[in-house]
């Protein structure tokens, strides 16, 4: 919110030691560099769970809406490799918003790209309800974003691709006792992006086109319990992310450049801590 970001990629740009790059003017592929290392050396977690697959990671930095994020934790250096094999450069842990009080918020931003008539149009909604006893609560979010294609040098080819995305999600908790709780989280993201030339025509009629249509579902369920003195803590969790992608990557009006990809990532585990 302080950075007026609409997605995770924009918010990470303000983190010290982290660099976000746009590496393709057609599809808008972004990667995050930690300590100068390429993006595939960084592990992205959602609520500390490694469900952010390699397929999702290609465009995922722009697909996670800012209004579902409570905070972002960045761990730099090889020590973060404890979180996964990809975490050589560092780890980015996205913590989703948890309900803390009854509230509702509606926001809309309109940003001009390079002072042109291309705009990034973003609408966000957040609401949360917490019971009077504080034993249960739920927060919901929604976002609708449209970004026009931006052609900086007027050659007919985009430097920034079109994005149309919609996302909804929730996070809830229920305290089963004084020192135990169940937490559930779910989100759904639809995103369409298109870059190249002749954006108003089918991609196989353009000179060059990259078009990607994503449908992403993800969620998690966790149980936490601790002793009264917090010296003994136990956590069990299960999480998933399912991604379906339809794409076109081609040039010279190639009719055979369409493709589909499906990816399912499931993670589960338990942790016991004694101090």
Which residues fall in each region the model found?
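Transmembrane beta-barrel architecture of outer-membrane proteins
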Residues: 3, 29, 59, 87-89, ...
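Outer-membrane beta-barrel channels and translocator barrels
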Residues: 5, 99, 131-134, 175-179, ...
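Extracytoplasmic beta-strand/coil segments of soluble accessory domains associated
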Residues: 9-53, 70-71
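Short acidic/polar hinge/loop motifs at secondary-structure boundaries
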Residues: 33, 49-76, 97
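Outer-membrane beta-barrel translocator/receptor signature
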Residues: 53-55, 68-70, 81-153, 161-168, ...
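Transmembrane beta-barrel strands of outer-membrane/channel proteins
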Residues: 106-112, 140-146, 184-188, 236-242, ...
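Residues on the lipid-exposed face of transmembrane beta-strands in outer-membrane beta-barrel proteins
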Residues: 125-131, 170-174, 221-225, 268-274
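Flexible loop and strand-edge segments within Gram-negative outer membrane beta-barrel domains
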Residues: 147-167, 173-175, 179-234, 240-264
């Amino acid at each position: 919110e302080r950075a007026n970001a609409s997605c995770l990629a924009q918010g990470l740009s303000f983190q010290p030691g982290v660099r976000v790059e746009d590496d393709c003017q057609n599809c808008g592929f972004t990667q995050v560099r930690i300590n100068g290392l390429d993006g595939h050396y960084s592990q992205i977690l959602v609520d500390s769970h490694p469900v952010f697959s390699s397929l999702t990671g290609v465009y995922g930095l722009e697909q996670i809406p800012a209004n579902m994020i409570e905070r972002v934790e960045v761990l730099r250096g090889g020590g973060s490799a404890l979180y996964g094999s990809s975490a050589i450069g560092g780890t980015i842990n996205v913590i989703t918003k948890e309900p803390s009080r009854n509230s509702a918020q509606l926001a809309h931003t309109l940003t001009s790209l390079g002072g042109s008539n291309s705009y990034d149009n973003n609408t966000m909604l957040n609401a949360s309800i917490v019971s009077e006893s504080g034993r249960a609560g739920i927060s919901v979010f929604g976002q609708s974003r449209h970004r026009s294609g931006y052609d900086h040098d007027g050659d007919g080819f985009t430097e920034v691709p079109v994005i149309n995305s919609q996302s909804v999600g929730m996070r809830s908790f229920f305290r089963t006792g004084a020192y135990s709780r169940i937490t559930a989280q779910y989100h759904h993201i639809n995103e369409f992006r298109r870059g190249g030339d002749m954006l108003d025509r089918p991609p196989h009629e353009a000179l060059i086109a990259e078009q990607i249509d994503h449908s992403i579902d993800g969620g998690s369920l966790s149980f936490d319990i601790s002793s009264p003195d917090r010296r003994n803590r136990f956590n069990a969790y299960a999480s998933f992310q399912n991604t379906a992608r339809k794409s076109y990557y081609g040039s010279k009006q190639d009719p055979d450049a369409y493709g589909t990809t499906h990816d399912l990532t499931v993670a589960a585990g338990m942790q016991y801590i004694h101090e």
